[in-house]
A protein has these predicted regions:
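Nucleotide/pyrophosphate-binding catalytic subdomain
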Residues: 2-127
Length: 127
């Protein structure tokens, strides 16, 4: 018997802020993802924050301090992506697809440690 998992192709889909800018657009993104799943692709989704959210968060950090701590800045601005990813995962589950949003520390993704400019040095993925 052939293990279908071994012959599945993987595709990485990246959706920018405008494409996830509203709930209706997120639903459309989920239809796109579902279309790849129907073609037996393993799908990895990367999403930006909804349009305008990152700018709003940046402005909030500036209103708190013109010298905002970079570690806290990174924690703050990443929340926009977390919201988008959770909404996408929730919608995918609603339409019957297995889905899970992940935060970088849950994998974990290891960086060189430079806040607001770090490069990924390692991704620890366990099958």
């Amino acid at each position: 018997m052939i293990n279908i998992q071994l012959i599945m192709k993987t595709i990485v889909l990246k959706f920018g802020g405008t494409s996830v800018g509203s709930i209706d657009r997120i639903k459309m993104v989920c239809k796109i993802i579902a279309s790849y799943k129907k073609k037996n692709y393993k799908v990895v989704v990367i999403s930006s924050a909804m349009s305008g959210v990152t700018n709003d968060l940046v402005n909030k950090s500036k209103s708190i301090s013109n010298n905002f701590d970079l570690a806290e800045y990174d924690a703050l601005v990443s929340t926009g992506e977390q919201v988008s990813c959770a909404l996408i995962a929730g919608r995918l589950k609603h339409i019957g697809l297995k889905s899970r949003s992940w935060l970088s520390w849950q994998l974990p993704i290891v960086t060189e440690g430079k806040y607001s400019g770090a490069r990924i040095s390692k991704i620890n993925i366990k099958e």
